[in-house]
Amino acid sequence: MKYVNKPVPKTDAMSLVTGKPVYTDDLAPSDCLIVKILRSPHANAWVEEIKTDAAKKIEGIACVLTYEDVSHKRFTLAGQTAPEISPWDRYIIDKHVRFVGDPVAIVAGETEEAVDKALKRIKVKYRVEEAVLDIHTAKDNPILVHPEDDWYMPIPVGGDNKRNLCSSNVEEVGDVDAMLEKCAYTVDQVYHTKANQQTMMKTFRTYCYMDHFQRLTVVSSTQIPFHIRRIVGNALNIPSSKVRVIKPRIGGGFGAKQSSVSEVFPALVTWVTGRPSKIVFSRKESMIASSPRHEMEVHIRMGADENGIVKAIDLYTLSNTGAYGEHGPTTVGLSGHKSIALYRHTEAYRFAYDVVYTNMQAAGAYRGYGATQGIFAVESAADELAHKMGMDPVKFRELNMPMEGEALPGYPDVPINGSCTMDKCLARAKEMIGWDEKYPFRDMGNGKVRGVGIAMAMQGSSIAGIDVGGADIKLNEDGSYTLALGCSDMGTGCDTILAQMAADCLDTDMKNIVVFSVDTDISPYDSGSYASSTTYATGNAVIQACGELRKRIHAFGAQMLGVSAEDSDFDGEKVRTEDGKEVTLQQIAGKATCGVCSELQVVKEYSSPISPPPFMVGAAEVEVDKETGQIDVIDYVGVIDCGTPINPNLARVQAEGGIGQGIGMVLYEDVQYTDKGKIRNNSFMQYKIPNRMDIPKVRIEFESSYEKTGPFGAKSIGELVIDTPCPAIANAVYNATGVRVRELPITPEKVAMGILEQEAGEKK
């Protein structure tokens, strides 16, 4: 292969560093109405009266819309394939506001000044009620977040709005309680992860206009163009055929833009007024009214026999979906399905969960999508079990880790683990971090100690039986190719990776591949860029489309030469016969566009019945100041099995970025609320994410397997890489200090207090 498995530079790298790409707001017409939202100051209240006359009289105001002006048909903002598994529990604006930041009115005007003035002129009378702000008391609470009778769940997954349940389920194989009784060693602990913000560089932003056919065009920074088309249609109660969605450059998403956070507001304004409009969320709005990671509490019981073989896992996840249920029923599933499976000998397991409504910001998708929370719990518990047995945590994992050709307990998306080098990943990570020399800790003097920790992880490659990747490849008259895609490049480099695949399939130079994405009127259908699906699902579609197009080009060239395809060869540049006759690709392309009914264009869709998991081992070295509790990550290594890395450089950058986000989750990030349900840390002044000085040396290596169902043997990588930092660093902190922190983030205060409690206990 000329391009696949090669570190090809991103096709847009130079334009990015020179500032040439334009983003959503750069493209918006100058005559757009400015759209802003009046948001609720209360966590749970009913709008008894809203006066908008004064606001409407302000010069330049085009419309002021309230709950009286919107469709009263419920819908969901979740970017999921229909029928969505998330409940339909929203109106665009509702009389019942359910969190601080819920929309109360939409204002659109000629200038930002006029809109800001109008927002202040709107007078609202609320009936404020007590809010549900604790996940532990939400279930069966007499205060209902969704008391309405038209709450609707397209797919029944245990939701009951009259119990504050978005979803609830129990899966069980074997007799877990009996097996745990037989185990020689058990642990029984609770682990708690908090909500985290995605903090992408570009906030949510959308502009809309009516085209000359009176169709609504939505231009938006989104990961899910085709789902946005359906969601906007549902929200406005209009046919999806009346909606066109165009994705410019995104400016980051990390899952936040897998929900339709901003699109419905300007879409409604443009539909009502007929005028172009735009909305640009402030950073504060993106932090109080978006779709952060689900807060989860995971109670785990784990048991092993006298030899260290894990026999039983009992896992219960309590997940906080907030005021609305986007992605609630699906994220929670990964907390068990992607964590229990890490221990291949498990004979009995139970995975139960409740997803509860609260009067807090609605959660959504974030890289890792629930697996991150579950893996933190299981990999922390695994270390605790190993320590209880007096066994090295690496040895413990060597005995239990996933192996190729064996089953993955609790993972429903592959019958047998078809591709896996976890054993090599573990051995290499152990070697790279210097485990034997550094475990469990080293005293560095001056009150500082260093410890090492390790963790395993797995994810998926698209959603089995649901996700669809699409590719449309055509030969242009000059011999170049246009590759139209329905997936969104969020900065991951998928446009480059898919062009690499196409170039190798067609035996052409990458510069001859022009990539176009995404316009729902032109691009082939694609579920969107989420669930680590693009390389695997869309990559397979690209390979199939290019393979078919290559056959057609060959056959057409052979026809031009008066021979059959079997009696000629095509090398990507020319079709040749053994007697020396030949025709060039450019000649074929030119002929195909002139008086010949032979279209040299192929559209293919791909969906997989399985989701082959990639695997990873992460190992961390931390330094802890025993007096202050300050934690510094000194070194982090990640060894990854993502099948064939199509572009090792881009895969490495993906890993480095995901590890950085994981470090933020484990050490810094925590969406905090007041007792009235207001978010305290709603800007970068208060919400701490790691900067460059907080990220250590990160070293990435690949131990490639070959996934026979993947494009060129590839699996996914995008989400997997955020899953190991939380448990690896938590385990390293424990090994350094003896303090086990089970609630994230692990702050200096928690560590320092833990050390003091240890010392007090020793004195007794």
Identify the residue ranges that each predicted region occupies:
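Short acidic, glycine/serine/threonine-rich loops at helix termini
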Residues: R74-G79, A118-R121, S220, R229-I231, ...
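Extended active-site and interfacial segments that coordinate phosphate-rich ligands
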Residues: T11-S15, K120-R127, A131-L133, Q223, ...
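Glycine-rich loop/linker segments at domain edges
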Residues: K6, D12-S15, A82-P83, D160-T206, ...
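Thiamine diphosphate
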Residues: R230, G251-G274, K278-I279, C494-A502
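C-terminal catalytic domains of large/alpha subunits in multi-subunit enzymes
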Residues: Y67-E68, N237-K242, V272-S277, E306, ...
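Catalytic phosphate/nucleotide-handling subdomain of diverse soluble enzymes
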Residues: S461-S523, T538
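Helix-loop-helix junctions that connect adjacent transmembrane helices in secondary transporters/permeases
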Residues: V145-L236, M401-S480, R680-E701
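Flexible, low-hydrophobicity surface segments
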Residues: M1-G158, V596
